[in-house]
Amino acid sequence: PVQKLDPEKALAEVNAFRTKNGRSAVVLDARLSQAAAVQSKDQARRSSIGHYGSDGSKPMQRAERAGFHAKLASENVAAGQKSFSDAMRSWEESSGHRENLLRPEVTAIGVAMAKNEDGRAYWTLVLGAE
């Protein structure tokens, strides 16, 4: 079964990875979590992953719609992992996702997970700066 998302635990995992790699810690931002939830739900509904929403939106637009005045908004998505930790591991091992995790200018994150009808999990991590 898929583990329930614990945003505080997810934040701790992101910060552990960032600080281990010489980057500053970030905070959890409800607006970015809202933007992440929109994308996770959209992906689960469509059973596909990507960075464009079904309405054509990009991560920056979704962050701004949620009230986050983004100078920067990047997004990591994953599907099928049973926990945030598993999704995080896959991002750490993928160069583009790793780069997003370690962007020095990032100050805040938002996280979300939604499941499709088959119980497959769609994870979204939005990383941003205002």
List each language-model region with its residue ranges.
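A short alpha-helix/helix-coil micro-patch that ends at or immediately precedes a cysteine
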Residues: 2-45
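Short, surface-exposed glycine/acidic/tryptophan-bearing loops
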Residues: 30-83, 101-103
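Short glycine-/small-residue-rich flexible loop motifs, especially phosphate/cofactor-binding loops
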Residues: 15, 60, 98
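Well-structured core secondary-structure elements of compact alpha/beta domains
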Residues: 1-4, 8, 74, 128-130
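Disulfide-stabilized extracellular recognition modules
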Residues: 79-130
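Conserved beta-strand positions that form and line the central face of beta-propeller blades
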Residues: 25, 76, 126
